[in-house]
């Protein structure tokens, strides 16, 4: 839960001092910008939260996958600012943490079947979300020096 709790602040720290242009830049061709990474984690947070709620509060509700690239294409049309994306992530993460903290050990052991991955428990999602956070935080850590070193657009 430590990773889940600290990720919003890590986003803030890693984006500090970067311009809107830098947050939207693609220093590695074909890879997401920092803004897109945070948007992706925000979309994922929504999907993971729904799955966890189904596991915790419904009986035998099937869990479905999602196409991250299609969600990203839709998000790009919305033209959301980085601050709004970050605030949306923080609000959803607070709700997710509240849900996990309110769950008993028996609740966290409840399961549902994912259409791609099979049986998953609510506690599996704590680890899955943390790993997803770490993966993308490391991606931002690698991108940041490239953005700082590049000439401003």
Give residue spans per PLM region.
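A short secondary-structure junction motif
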Residues: 14, 18-21, 59, 103-106, ...
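Short acidic/polar alpha-helix capping motifs at helix-coil junctions
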Residues: 1-2, 14-17, 60-62, 74-77, ...
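A glycine-rich, hydrophobic loop/mini-helix early in the fold
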Residues: 6-29
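Short, contiguous alpha-helical
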Residues: 24-68, 97, 111-153
